[in-house]
């Protein structure tokens, strides 16, 4: 028995934990469902084996050619299918393009409640709670977990997240160091490297440098301003310029900026208080964001905020009004003031209007229309770049170079930008001697597989956009949008035909050329002839409808050069 060979005991294979190494076939899948090749709808899925965490869940705003559409949100079929694998949802900050989609996405994926932890900083969760309540959801039904912008989170068995504070155009903004069994990923989140932020809280680059020293497998970084050379101006520079122009304004001052730009609003309030002006706010989103920021201590006022009614009878030099409308939105306060449609107040000569913002791509014409109207009403209008009253919240080229140098990643994925921004970031990296093949240009819906040695696109998941129209989500198709554009551009002609013993036709046009009685009379005659023939020959209603549609379409095109939407409605009498 003593000489009998002993069999080695089989050891149980341990699952990889934080800092441990996965097997040679292990990989992380990175799946952007929004935010690649576009501005907005930011949401990214990270998966290792059977565990997922999601980063952000944003929305986008409709472009000019999307009539009737209120919001755009990303399709999340993949997350609905794999909901049981989701271990956490992590929010980098409270901007709409990062959390605005959650009141729609959370019920789609989880229903009206979920135990999955949703991590966010204090202001971020404060804004999210307000959004959930606004859409009839109970914040308490979702597992909202407050963290600081520099916390560590253990997500499931495989992901350890070290958040790091990054300056941006909203407080409590973070990037994330993602430690996985195969290596480290650094995600910058939205950022700029502001040396003198309004709240004094600078970017925590020590964590970025530490990750770089340990070795970064993949860098995912903000490409928004990759075309801009130099550095993005500090928010404190903008505060000084706002102080200067508000101090010199002779009459009332109106300021518009993004409602979520708490630091900019704080700068305006400081200047108003310095020069003895009472601050009133007008506009739903401005009031909502500021109320939450005040309650949570992110916005400070010496006195209090006033209503329009309280300041309208004060001397002009004692009044400052913060208003919505930085993007020229038709129902915003500034737009209504510019077009003399505001019920409580009107622009008058001697007023100063400050646009402390820059137009989002696609909104330039709307903003210019508002500016021109304000000038026509006698206001002084101050806007960038003529006045230094706005700075971007995103890093320019020299700041992006610093992040690349601190992390020296093996692989690189430019994120948060249109294709031109991504490409310019790629070229910037190549100018620093990075191999071109180590950088991928991200696409929504792509599945990227990251191993210790490779980073490649290996497939796609269902992706795209859902249109939000009032209470409807996803029930607007591209075909419906095309119909709406057609009606908006060419107009509508409705032909109502009653098929019976005594056929009757009525014709109504909207948004079409000024159709005289002769033109509409000819349409009515053609439709009535087709209707009578159809009734006599006992044709199906669909066939009668076609017999009306095609001749009328051809006639109107020839007579007017226009191609209106023609809607024949044939009713059996």
From Swiss-Prot:
Cofactor(s) for this UniProt protein: Zn(2+)
Pfam families: Lactamase_B_2, RMMBL, RNase_J_b_CASP, RNase_J_C
Enzyme class, broadest EC rank: hydrolase
GO molecular function: 5'-3' RNA exonuclease activity; identical protein binding; RNA binding; RNA endonuclease activity; zinc ion binding
Region of interest called Disordered, as start-end residue ranges on this chain: 1-29
Binding site for substrate: 259-261, 390-394
Single Gene Ontology BP annotation: rRNA processing
Keywords per UniProt: Cytoplasm, Endonuclease, Exonuclease, Hydrolase, Metal-binding, Nuclease, RNA-binding, rRNA processing, Zinc
Subcellular compartments: Cytoplasm
Primary localization class, coarse: cytoplasm
EC numbers on record: 3.1.-.-
Outcome following mutation: residue 95 to A: Catalytically inactive
UniProt superkingdom: Bacteria
Keyword presence, Thylakoid: no
One Gene Ontology cellular component annotation held by this UniProt entry: cytoplasm
Complex and partners: Homodimer. May be a subunit of the RNA degradosome.
Family as reported in the entry's similarity comment: Belongs to the metallo-beta-lactamase superfamily. RNA-metabolizing metallo-beta-lactamase-like family. Bacterial RNase J subfamily.
Protein function: An RNase that has endonuclease and possibly 5'-3' exonuclease activity. Probably involved in maturation of rRNA and in some organisms also mRNA maturation and/or decay.
Protein name as it appears in the record: Ribonuclease J
Protein source organism: Thermus thermophilus (strain ATCC BAA-163 / DSM 7039 / HB27)
């Amino acid at each position: 028995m003593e000489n009998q060979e002993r069999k080695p005991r089989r050891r149980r294979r341990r699952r990889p934990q934080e800092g441990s190494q996965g097997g040679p076939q292990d990989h992380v899948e990175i799946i952007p469902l929004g935010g690649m090749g576009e501005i907005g709808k930011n949401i990214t899925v990270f998966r290792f084996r059977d565990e997922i965490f999601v980063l952000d869940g944003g929305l986008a705003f409709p472009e000019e050619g999307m009539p009737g559409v209120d919001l755009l949100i990303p399709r999340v079929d993949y997350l609905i299918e794999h909901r049981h694998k989701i271990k956490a949802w992590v929010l980098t900050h409270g901007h709409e393009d990062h959390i605005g989609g959650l009141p729609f996405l959370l019920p789609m994926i989880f229903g009206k409640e979920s135990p999955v932890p949703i991590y966010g900083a204090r202001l971020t969760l404060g804004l999210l709670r307000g959004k959930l309540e606004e859409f009839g959801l109970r914040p308490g039904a979702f597992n909202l977990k407050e963290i600081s912008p520099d916390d560590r989170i253990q997500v499931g068995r495989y992901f350890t997240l070290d958040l790091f504070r990054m300056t941006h155009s909203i407080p409590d903004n973070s990037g994330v160091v993602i430690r996985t069994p195969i290596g480290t990923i650094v995600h910058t989140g939205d950022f700029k490297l502001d040396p003198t932020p309004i709240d004094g809280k600078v970017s925590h680059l020590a964590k970025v440098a530490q990750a770089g020293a340990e070795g970064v497998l993949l860098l995912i970084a903000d490409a928004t301003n990759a075309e801009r050379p130099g550095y993005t101006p500090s928010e404190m520079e903008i505060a000084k310029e706002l102080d200067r122009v508000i101090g010199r304004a002779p009459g009332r001052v109106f300021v518009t900026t993004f409602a979520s730009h708490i630091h900019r609003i704080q700068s305006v309030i400081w200047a108003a208080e310095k020069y003895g002006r009472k601050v009133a706010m007008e506009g739903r989103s401005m009031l909502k964001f500021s109320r939450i920021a005040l309650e949570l201590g992110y916005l400070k006022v010496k006195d209090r905020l006033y209503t329009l009614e309280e300041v309208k009878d004060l001397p002009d030099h004692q009044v400052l009004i913060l208003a919505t409308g930085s993007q020229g939105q038709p129902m915003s306060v500034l737009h209504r003031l510019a077009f003399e449609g505001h019920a409580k107040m009107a622009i008058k000569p001697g007023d100063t209007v400050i646009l402390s913002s820059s137009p989002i791509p696609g909104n330039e014409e709307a903003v210019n229309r508002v500016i021109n109207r304000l000038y026509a009403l006698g206001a002084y209008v101050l806007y960038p770049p003529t006045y230094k009253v706005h700075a971007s919240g995103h890093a320019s080229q020299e700041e992006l170079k610093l992040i690349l140098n601190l992390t020296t990643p093996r692989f690189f994925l430019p994120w948060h930008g249109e294709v031109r921004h991504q490409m310019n970031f790629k070229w910037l990296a190549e100018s620093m001697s990075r191999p071109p093949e180590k950088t991928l240009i991200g696409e929504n819906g792509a599945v990227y597989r990251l191993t210790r040695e490779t980073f490649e696109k290996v497939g796609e998941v269902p992706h795209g956009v859902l249109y939000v129209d009032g209470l409807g989500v996803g029930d607007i198709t591209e075909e419906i949008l095309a119909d709406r554009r057609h009606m908006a551009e060419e107009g509508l002609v409705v032909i109502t035909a009653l098929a019976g013993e005594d056929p009757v036709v009525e014709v109504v046009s909207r948004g079409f050329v000024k159709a005289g009685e002769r033109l509409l009379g000819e349409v009515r005659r053609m439709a009535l002839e087709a209707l009578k023939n159809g009734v006599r020959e006992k044709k199906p209603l669909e066939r009668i409808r076609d017999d009306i549609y095609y001749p009328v379409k051809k006639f109107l095109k020839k007579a007017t050069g226009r191609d209106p939407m023609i809607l024949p409605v044939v009713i059996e009498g």
